[in-house]
């Protein structure tokens, strides 16, 4: 086994300083192996594993680059010169005789975007932090979700752009896709991001432990699967364990795969049935279609993309039709069979009749469930239901001092929502200063933030705040302004004029309370919409803001103008 150098910030080589271990030494997670000198200063390089060092592959004073092998080691289950187990191990696999006991201010369980951001923020505020992760840092988002999916989508987007090169006066003949290299790039991005997170946690003096954590009734966190095990007495505990794909009973056929398996499968099938037209399903639909796969989406609901703006969904539906993606709504899958040739037959009910569809593979994208150990939660006295761990308005569970953030609390399944919730929890733990007196306001009530949402179809959708449908249900009187990208100069330059920007204004206060962009750069425009809503901007305040020309963001300004005097570059 090898211990490699992680990501070196700035891209320049580091210099090896004092080597703190010798061949034959037993090392534990968090133990300093080597001191390094980088452009960011002197940093200790710490072990993330338990094992015995068998070879030192670097010399003091030598240059080190990202990915260089620094040490070779053997794990606890072999070759350490004793009985095949590490120090303090018992005679049975997975059972530790020695237990390390630790005290910390905050114990964070889960190293995804909720957990690691919480840990970094807490450490930056001066708290002692322990982060426990059973798998890889970055969680689902970095390893099996947001990041790898968007890396593949970027390759698909470039491939699609090259096929349209003639529109821009460029000849690009004999374009070929090397899927191994496409997936290698995806894997490299994930690997570099993991190394970056590890570097940041180490630099912030966050103790990282690999293992499975369980909260005990006295707010002690027990960690197993490591050697040794750990008992961590924490002042506060943050549960950030994320979620997992839901796989119905009919999806147990070998022809079915979930999103995790799809991201590891380097072959693009010639045909694919996707069950579920939510965000994950539709992003994969556009991804596979871009690489030449025949895609058929089957959705139980009578609309796609959940609660997304209906007008934006219509833009995506038209784009899907143009790309040859078939979508069947109001359809219930009943069973999936594998044929002798290894292909799939999906049976589904629609309009009172049974239908059958054939494809090489089936991708199941019907939703995600919270990742939680129900038995352990019951033993600890922490309440939960099928949506996730129950929390109050301050994200605190039924056990005082224990919080749940991100997917596991069932509120909103977005990585940036988990990060925002984690930061809010730490602010609540520390208290906030009163601006007038300078004193501390202990345990401030957490205010629900405006969480933007992005869907990486082609074109994209970005939204924030309330939708028109929500406003109707809540009897909020609003005025709506829509500006089409056909009237935006930058959209025409990019050759992407589908879609629009929509702003929703509360009539009485004239505050912007919602917005949606469907079209080019919508993922970036979602942040612009969130800023306007979070800061209670009115149509006047937004329209007085100067937006650079030519940019797609001008569509936001035009929509704001449409709420009062009227759009400048568009008239219905």
Regions found by a protein language model. Give the residues of each.
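Short hydrophobic core segments
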Residues: 107-109, 213, 231-242, 274-275, ...
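Acidic, low-complexity mobile loops and tails
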Residues: 1-35, 44, 84-85
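Glycine-rich dinucleotide-binding loop and its adjacent helix/turn
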Residues: 87-88, 146, 239-294, 298, ...
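Generic structural motif
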Residues: 5, 9-18, 47-55, 64, ...
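Glycine-rich flavin
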Residues: 85, 93-103, 120-127, 132-268, ...
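Beta1/beta-strand and adjacent pyrophosphate-binding region of the FAD-binding site
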Residues: 97-114, 268-278
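FAD-site-proximal beta/loop scaffold in flavoenzymes
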Residues: 254-270, 358-439, 524
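Flexible, glycine-rich terminal cap/loop adjacent to redox cofactors
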Residues: 109-114, 118, 123-135, 140, ...
């Amino acid at each position: 086994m090898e211990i490699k150098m992680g990501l070196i910030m700035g891209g320049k080589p580091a210099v090896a300083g004092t080597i703190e271990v010798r061949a034959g030494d037993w090392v534990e997670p968090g133990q300093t192996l080597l001191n390094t000198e980088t452009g960011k200063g002197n940093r200790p390089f710490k072990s993330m594993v338990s094992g015995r060092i068998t070879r030192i592959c670097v010399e003091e004073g030598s240059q080190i680059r990202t990915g260089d092998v620094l040490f070779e080691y053997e794990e606890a289950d072999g070759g350490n010169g004793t009985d095949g187990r590490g120090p303090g191990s018992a005679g049975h696999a997975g059972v530790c005789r020695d237990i390390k006991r630790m005290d910390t201010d905050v114990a964070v369980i889960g190293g995804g975007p909720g957990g690691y951001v919480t840990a970094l923020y807490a450490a930056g505020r001066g708290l002692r932090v322990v982060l426990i992760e059973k798998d890889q840092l970055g969680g689902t988002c970095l390893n099996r979700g947001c990041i790898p999916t968007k890396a593949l989508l970027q390759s698909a987007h470039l491939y699609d752009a090259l096929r349209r090169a003639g529109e821009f006066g460029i000849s690009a003949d004999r374009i070929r896709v090397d899927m191994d290299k496409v997936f290698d790039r995806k894997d490299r991005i994930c690997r570099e991001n993991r190394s970056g997170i590890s570097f940041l946690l180490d630099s912030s003096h966050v103790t990282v432990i690999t293992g499975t954590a369980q909260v005990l009734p006295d707010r002690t966190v027990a960690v197993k699967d490591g050697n040794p095990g750990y008992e961590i007495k924490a002042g506060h505990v943050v549960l950030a364990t994320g979620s997992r794909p839901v796989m119905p009973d009919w999806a147990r056929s070998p022809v079915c795969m979930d999103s995790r398996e799809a991201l590891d499968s380097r072959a693009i099938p010639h045909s694919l049935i996707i069950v579920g037209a939510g965000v994950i399903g539709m992003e994969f639909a556009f991804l596979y279609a871009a690489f030449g796969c025949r895609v058929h989406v089957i959705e139980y609901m009578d609309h796609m993309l959940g609660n997304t703006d209906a007008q934006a969904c219509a833009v995506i539906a038209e784009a899907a039709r143009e790309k040859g993606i078939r979508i069947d709504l109001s359809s219930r899958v009943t069973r999936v069979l594998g044929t002798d040739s290894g292909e799939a037959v999906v049976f589904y009910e629609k309009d009172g009749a049974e239908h059958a569809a054939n494809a090489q593979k089936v991708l199941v994208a019907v939703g995600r469930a919270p990742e939680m150990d129900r038995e352990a939660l019951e033993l600890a006295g922490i309440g939960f239901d099928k949506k996730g761990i129950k929390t109050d308005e301050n994200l605190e569970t039924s056990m005082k001092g224990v919080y749940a953030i991100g997917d596991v609390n069932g509120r909103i399944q977005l990585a940036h929502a988990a990060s925002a919730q984690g930061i809010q929890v730490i602010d609540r733990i520390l208290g906030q200063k009163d601006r007038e007196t300078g004193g501390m306001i202990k345990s401030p009530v957490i205010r629900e933030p405006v969480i933007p949402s992005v869907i990486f179809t082609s074109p994209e959708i970005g939204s924030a705040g309330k939708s028109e449908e929500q406003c109707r249900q809540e009897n909020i009187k609003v005025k709506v302004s829509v500006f089409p990208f056909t009237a935006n100069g930058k959209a025409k330059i990019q050759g992407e004029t589908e879609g629009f920007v929509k702003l929703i204004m509360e009539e009485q206060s004239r505050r912007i309370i919602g917005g949606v962009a469907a079209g080019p750069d919508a993922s970036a425009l979602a942040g612009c919409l969130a800023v306007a809503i979070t800061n209670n901007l009115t149509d006047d305040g937004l329209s007085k803001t100067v937006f650079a020309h030519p940019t797609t963001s001008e569509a936001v300004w035009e929509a704001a103008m449409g709420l009062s005097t009227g759009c400048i570059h568009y008239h219905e």
